[in-house]
Amino acid sequence: MSDQYAPKPEHKFTFGLWTVGNPGRDPFGPPTRPHLSPVDIVHLLGEVGAYGVNFHDNDLVPIDATPAEHDQIVKDFKKALADTGLKVPMATTNLFSDPAFKDGAFTSNDPRVRAYALSKTMKAMDLGVELGAKVYVVWGGREGVETDAAKDALEAGKRFRDALNFLTHYAKDQKYDLVFALEAKPNEPRHDIYLPTTGSFLGFIETLDHPEMVGVNPEVAHEHMSGLNF
């Protein structure tokens, strides 16, 4: 590869821990790649000229980690960032893997699950800001239904709005230099996901308490699933 095309940090390419660390598993078979720790991934990205690394909370800290384990993982990750010069531009929350979210996170019919989703997101925001994130992505992969009778769509929209309002107020109260980006997808893992397109999110954002703090994160493959493009 000529120097002209060699990747450099100033090109601002960033990668998710969940992409580089993917074990090569699909629904029909077991993992096919060796495990890479978050620290390993940061050093690998540093070697190939990446600018930064992004993560879901549980990509970095396992959901069942003890407080002591959490602190050690974050300490080691910070050292890897310092050693390589990589940045953390964006962070997000895994609101889809825990079985508690089978009916949704912010839109769940169970108020205990909705409270858990908010608590998990606030802790993940704290972690993201601690590591330098300026953008916080919200992807509602479980916010939807398999059948319309499962959930009141209008009530679900209100719950989602209340959650975003709560989180923007939390960010302001904590004086975080943080903006939110809403990521759309029409389906998967739910059969029908609420607010399935970037356009629907643009309309939704205008109904929030602090629309100036919220934007969109168009994901190429998700847009194509809706028959859209950039």
Explain the meaning of each model-derived region.
Residues 1-17:
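N-terminal amphipathic alpha-helix/helix-capping segment at the start of soluble metabolic enzymes
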Residues 15, 55, 138, 182, ...:
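Conserved beta-strand positions
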Residues 16-25:
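Short polar catalytic/cofactor-binding loops
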Residues 33-40, 44, 65-79:
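Aromatic- and glycine-enriched glycan-recognition loops and surfaces
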Residues 33-61, 123, 132:
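Catalytic domains of carbohydrate-active enzymes, especially glycoside hydrolases
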Residues 52-77, 140-141:
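Glycine-rich, proline-tolerant flexible connector loops at the mouths of alpha/beta enzymes
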Residues 72-93, 97-215, 225:
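Active-site acidic/histidine proton-transfer and metal-coordination neighborhood
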Residues 226-230:
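Histidine/acidic-residue-rich catalytic or RNA/ligand-binding cores of hydrolases
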